[in-house]
Swiss-Prot record:
GO terms for biological process, alphabetical: peptide transport
Assigned protein family: Belongs to the peptide uptake permease (PUP) (TC 9.A.18) family.
Protein name as annotated: Bacteroid development protein BacA
Domain of life: Bacteria
Main location: membrane
Subcellular location: Cell inner membrane
NCBIfam families registered for this protein in UniProt: PRK11098.1, PRK12369.1
GO cellular component, one term: plasma membrane
Sample GO molecular function, one term: peptide transmembrane transporter activity
Species the sequence originates in: Rhizobium meliloti (strain 1021) (Ensifer meliloti)
Keywords from the UniProt entry: Cell inner membrane, Cell membrane, Membrane, Plasmid, Transmembrane, Transmembrane helix, Transport
Membrane topology, as annotated: Multi-pass membrane protein
Stretches that traverse the bilayer: 11-31, 61-81, 92-112, 143-163, 210-230, 247-267, 336-356
InterPro entries: ABC1_TM_sf, ABC_transporter_sub-D, SbmA_BacA
Length: 420
């Protein structure tokens, strides 16, 4: 799954995590100030960033682009020399580019949040008639937002195009790897589906979850300091009362609660998804045989195989029913949680409309980052089922025992109803 595309996968991912951590620490330990020697100084203390699209080519941003390129280039150069790999340009440099695009999308959110405050304060002044506000000022504010949105959409579309090629290259690498070992793999149940379909789904799902995880981490790095700052204004929570860093603790508590709650409710889903793929593969395989052999795909056999499909789907529907009830209830409550937390501050008159929108946006960004597992749980379930299927291939190639769920199927004589 990984060795076909990445050089020495285990060491590669560990080293990339360590290198990324060192790069972040070096940046905050003084790396961001080095740009001053190149004519790209950071913002002076106390000065607010530029509001609008021009922030993306301001001197602090330009220096970060150079810093990231150097860090990524050094990491790639090491791996190109240490463990050359056919797909190294896509797996190493391609991954670095996707991470950079993820960082850029987070900075778009930061830029939009900075735009919220002045614009909504302007609206409040116009509605309350506390200061003269012209239509031109409001139109100008909306044009500022449009500039940010245009850059975000352009970069986002280009990133999606690149990611599509990245995923297909990963699928190609897995396909070539498994086809090269096909004589040993062809006897594994549903081997054709595992090569043709599961490789495609695995690469796209891992990429989606990986980008989501990186985005969550970068969002926390970008927005947690802002949330700490706003916690100075919002230091009282409903029911709990006054506590330091109230907004941060509220976001952590609510996200951890949702993660544990939904993980417990959906614990049975990965195994059921795996079995669903197995019964579908068995039914499809018999139909394919029936296209070329008259003695295959007889009505009785097809009826038995379809009974397995129906039985597993009905079990899946039942378990997804209560999981979706729990998930939807939590997400609906989540829509109100930010406003619920701000009620004491709103009643006390501590917030303007602009600041309230900024706080809600920042709180939502941090909360969603902590809720990575909640928002990704159904995708994680899908990935686990795919991983279990491809893991059987890995086991055959390294002469390891098959995963338990495959052994149960073999021990049951290939009869799905006895393996459940």
């Amino acid at each position: 799954m990984f060795q076909s595309f990445f050089p020495k996968p285990k060491l590669f991912f560990i080293s990339s995590a360590v290198w990324s951590l060192l790069a972040v620490l070096a940046w905050y330990a003084g790396g961001r100030d080095i740009g001053a020697y190149l004519g790209l100084p950071p913002l002076p203390p106390g000065q607010e960033p530029v509001i609008g699209v021009s922030v993306f080519w301001s001197t602090p941003f330009l220096w970060f682009y150079i810093y990231y390129a150097v860090v990524a280039g050094l990491f790639a150069a090491f791996w190109f020399a240490y463990s050359p790999h056919r797909w190294q340009y896509w797996s190493v440099l391609g991954t670095a580019l996707i991470i950079f695009n993820t960082y850029f999308s987070v900075q778009v959110s930061v830029a939009i949040n900075a735009w919220y405050g002045p614009f909504y304060d302007l609206i409040q002044q116009a509605l309350a008639r506390t200061a003269p506000v012209t239509a031109g000022q409001l139109y100008s504010g909306m044009i500022g937002f449009s500039g940010i949105a245009f850059v975000a959409v352009t970069v986002g579309v280009l990133n999606l195009f690149f990611v599509s090629h990245y995923i297909f290259r990963w699928r190609t690498a897995m396909n070539e790897f498994y086809v090269a070992h096909w004589p040993r793999l062809r006897h594994v149940e549903g081997a054709s589906q595992r090569v043709q379909e599961d490789t495609m789904r695995f690469s796209s799902t891992v990429e989606r979850l990986g980008v989501g995880l990186v985005s969550s981490i970068m969002t926390l790095i970008a927005f947690l300091p802002v949330l700490f700052k706003f916690s100075e204004q919002v230091n009282v929570l409903p029911i709990v009362g006054e506590i330091p860093h109230a907004l941060v603790w509220a976001a952590v508590f609510w996200s951890v609660f949702g993660t544990v709650f939904l993980a417990a409710v959906g614990i049975k889903l990965p195994g059921l998804e795996f079995r669903n793929q197995r019964v579908e593969a068995a039914y499809r395989k018999e139909l394919v045989y029936g296209e070329d052999h008259e003695d295959r795909a007889d009505p009785i056999t097809l009826a038995q195989l379809f009974d397995n499909v129906r039985r597993n789907y009905f079990r899946l529907y039942f378990h997804y029913m209560y999981f979706n009830i729990a998930r939807i209830f939590y997400l609906q409550a989540d829509n109100l949680f930010g406003t619920f937390v701000l009620v004491p501050a709103i009643v006390a008159g501590k917030l303007t409309l602009g600041v309230m929108n900024q706080v809600l946006n920042v709180f939502g960004q941090v909360r969603e980052s902590f809720q990575y597992l909640v928002n990704s749980w159904t995708t994680i379930v899908e990935l686990l089922s795919i991983y279990k299927r491809l893991k059987a291939f890995e086991s055959v190639l390294v002469d390891e025992p098959l995963p338990e769920i495959d052994r149960q199927f073999i021990d049951a004589g290939g009869k799905e109803e006895l393996a459940l």
